Amino acid sequence: MEFQKYRTMHFPRDVYIGHDVLNRVLDVVDQNSRTRDVIIVTGNTTYELAGKKIVEILASSPYEVHLSFAGEANYENLKKIEEETNDVNAGIIIGVGGGTKIDLAKKLAYDKNLPFISIPTSPSHDGIASPRASLRRNGISYSEEGAMPIGVIADTSVMIKAPYRYLAAGAADVISNISAVKDWKLAHRLRGEEFSSSAAAMSEYSAQEVISQVGEIRKYDESSVWLVTKNILASGTAMAIAGNSRPGSGSEHLFAHALEAAGVNNMLHGEMCAMGTIVSLYLHDDNWQKIRDVFESLGVSVKARDYGLKEEVVIEALRRAHAIRPERYTILGESDMSYDAAVKALELTGII
């Protein structure tokens, strides 16, 4: 039989990670923008951290910069940004900020079929360099196809200004690749889902690299930020190879999104994924204790009470997490987990 398999992969072309690299934005824009108009999606705080300097650099070139100050990553705000920028003959879109601003920018770039530059101001999760955008509607998070960044500019001198909690959450998000890949392998074995061994290996390597460097990460200097960020980038690249988010999103992310749907809003994405990773590894009958110890060493709690969560909220999130993305098969199965099984898993792992 003639071999007919093919796949298109998109990767970042210009990646700058390190001290004082914001000024490289002009090089990346010059090489990739189709016009002299640039759209920047940012927030009030992140504008002061990095956006203002980027505007000054580009405006002196000169580029016409169109700023869009965005709120949460939801479909309402996406529509608002689209309406604000409809008449702009933009040649490139830049996202400056944390996960929400970057998700909105990458989705906007995808919808407009424009190149996208990711400029994170904190290393809080692995969406910095992935082709997926997480947007919410009615409290539910949906994973949408977004533009893979043509450029990533991660300035450690900017990112170090974020609280350590954000760095720890980003590290936890990368570590959660362990359970995501286990779910992917399970879906491949039981459902015949397409599997990429190279994407899985890159994803797992990123997680193990972070685990092996917890002591360095805890120092919380620019080197710590660089270490976590480079593995976040590798995780995003794994998703680009796979053509989907499987290398970095499994049952632990479904659980995280179920918590969000239940109204939990005082946890960072990586913290929710850490909690989900522990219960996922327990269900996989893997060494969840080891990973729980790693999270504790990072300073990431997986105990519901430390976030003020009611036990019933966590129990119901676990029971119904599978329904967040019913097409994504994981260790959670295809129907609601029994109440007793959910309680047992959460109690034995120390989550409740």
Curated annotation (Swiss-Prot):
GO BP term, example: glycerophospholipid metabolic process
Reaction(s) the record says it catalyses: sn-glycerol 1-phosphate + NAD(+) = dihydroxyacetone phosphate + NADH + H(+); sn-glycerol 1-phosphate + NADP(+) = dihydroxyacetone phosphate + NADPH + H(+)
Coiled coil: none
UniProt: Zn(2+) binding residues: D173, H253, H269
Source organism superkingdom: Archaea
Pathway connected to this protein: Membrane lipid metabolism; glycerophospholipid metabolism
One GO molecular-function entry: glycerol-1-phosphate dehydrogenase (NAD+) activity
Positions contributing to substrate binding: D126, D173, H257
Gene3D superfamilies assigned to the protein according to its UniProt record, in alphabetical order: 3.40.50.1970, Dehydroquinate synthase-like - alpha domain (1.20.1090.10)
Keywords for this protein: Cytoplasm, Lipid biosynthesis, Lipid metabolism, Metal-binding, NAD, NADP, Oxidoreductase, Phospholipid biosynthesis, Phospholipid metabolism, Zinc
Binding site for NAD(+): G99, T100, K101, I102, D103, T121, S122, P123, S124, S130
Subcellular location: Cytoplasm
Family: Belongs to the glycerol-1-phosphate dehydrogenase family.
NCBIfam families: PRK00843.1
PANTHER family: GLYCEROL DEHYDROGENASE, GLYCEROL DEHYDROGENASE 1
Name the UniProt record assigns to this protein: Glycerol-1-phosphate dehydrogenase [NAD(P)+]
